[in-house]
Curated annotation (Swiss-Prot):
Lineage: Bacteria, Bacillati, Bacillota, Bacilli, Lactobacillales
EC number, as in UniProt: 2.1.1.33
Gene3D superfamilies: Vaccinia Virus protein VP39 (3.40.50.150)
Keywords, sorted A to Z: Methyltransferase, S-adenosyl-L-methionine, Transferase, tRNA processing
Superkingdom field: Bacteria
Binding site for substrate: K122, D154, T191, E192, Y193, E194
Annotated S-adenosyl-L-methionine binding sites: E44, D69, D96, D118
PROSITE patterns: SAM_MT_TRMB
Gene Ontology CC: tRNA methyltransferase complex
UniProt xrefs under NCBIfam families: PRK00121.2-2, tRNA (guanosine(46)-N7)-methyltransferase TrmB
Protein known as: tRNA (guanine-N(7)-)-methyltransferase
Keyword flag Transferase: yes
Purpose of the protein: Catalyzes the formation of N(7)-methylguanine at position 46 (m7G46) in tRNA.
C-alpha cells in the first residue's frame, strides 16, 4: 500500500548512516563486519513502518536484523522506530526484494520474513508476488542450506498461492497456522497491518517453509 510522501524523508535517511545503509552493494559478504559480530542475520522483505523488525530486534538481542523496503517514506517511519528504540542490532535498506543477491553473499542471511506482502491478485501480476518462483530463487541463494521463510498474511488467496508455490519449489512446510491468533505463537511480534486486521476480526495465516 502506498503512503503519502513525507517531507524530509530523504534527509532523515541520509542523516542516520548508523542505521540506514546507503551503499548496500559494497556490504555484500561483509555484513558480520558491519554489525561488528558473527550473530545470525535475519531480514524482513517489505518491512513497512518497522514495527515487526524493531520488535524482533528488541526481543532477540543476539540476532541481527535488516529491514528492507523500496518506499522511502515508509522506510523513514521505520527509522523513527529504530531511533526511538536505539538498538544496535538493526539496519535498514531501501532496495527492491528482487535484487537481494546484489547485497548479500550466498548463505549470508540466516532467516527471511515476509509479512503482509502485496497480494497482487490479478493473474497478470503473479510475477510480482514475493512468493513467486523467481523470488524464491533469490531467497534460496542468500539463505543457508535448509534456510527458512516465515510468512504471514491476512489474504487467504495469497496464502494458498504461497503454500502451493513453496511446495512446488520443493520446500517443506514445517508448520502452518490457519488462525494464528486463535492457535497462538509464543513470542509473536505483530506488524501494523496484523494488529489492524486482527482487531477487525480477520484471520491471520502463517507458515514456516524450509528450503531443501
Amino acid at each position: 500500500m502506498r503512503v503519502r510522501n513525507r517531507k524530509g524523508a530523504s534527509e532523515l535517511l541520509a542523516n542516520n548512516p548508523q542505521y540506514v545503509i546507503s551503499n548496500p552493494e559494497e556490504c555484500k559478504g561483509k555484513w558480520a563486519e558491519i554489525f561488528g559480530n558473527n550473530n545470525p542475520i535475519h531480514i524482513e522483505v517489505g518491512s513497512g513502518k518497522g514495527r515487526f523488525v524493531t520488535g524482533m530486534a528488541a526481543q532477540n538481542p543476539d540476532i541481527n536484523y535488516i529491514g528492507i523496503d523500496i518506499q522511502m517514506t515508509v522506510l523513514s517511519y521505520a527509522l523513527d522506530r529504530v531511533l526511538e528504540a536505539g538498538l544496535p542490532n538493526i539496519k535498514l535498506l531501501q532496495v527492491d526484494g528482487s535484487s537481494l543477491t546484489n547485497y548479500f553473499a550466498p548463505a549470508e542471511i540466516d532467516q527471511l520474513y515476509l509479512n503482509f506482502s502485496d497480494p497482487w491478485p490479478k493473474k497478470r501480476h503473479e510475477k510480482r508476488r514475493l512468493t513467486y518462483k523467481s523470488f524464491l530463487d533469490t531467497y534460496k541463494e542468500i539463505l543457508p542450506e535448509k534456510g527458512e521463510i516465515h510468512f504471514k498474511t491476512d489474504n487467504r488467496g495469497l496464502f494458498e498461492y504461497s503454500l502451493a508455490s513453496f511446495s512446488q519449489y520443493g520446500m517443506v512446510l514445517k508448520q502452518v497456522w490457519l488462525d494464528l491468533h486463535a492457535d497462538g505463537l509464543e513470542g509473536n511480534v505483530m506488524t501494523e497491518y496484523e494488529e489492524k486486521f486482527s482487531n477487525k476480526g480477520q484471520v491471520i495465516y502463517r507458515v514456516e517453509a524450509q528450503f531443501q
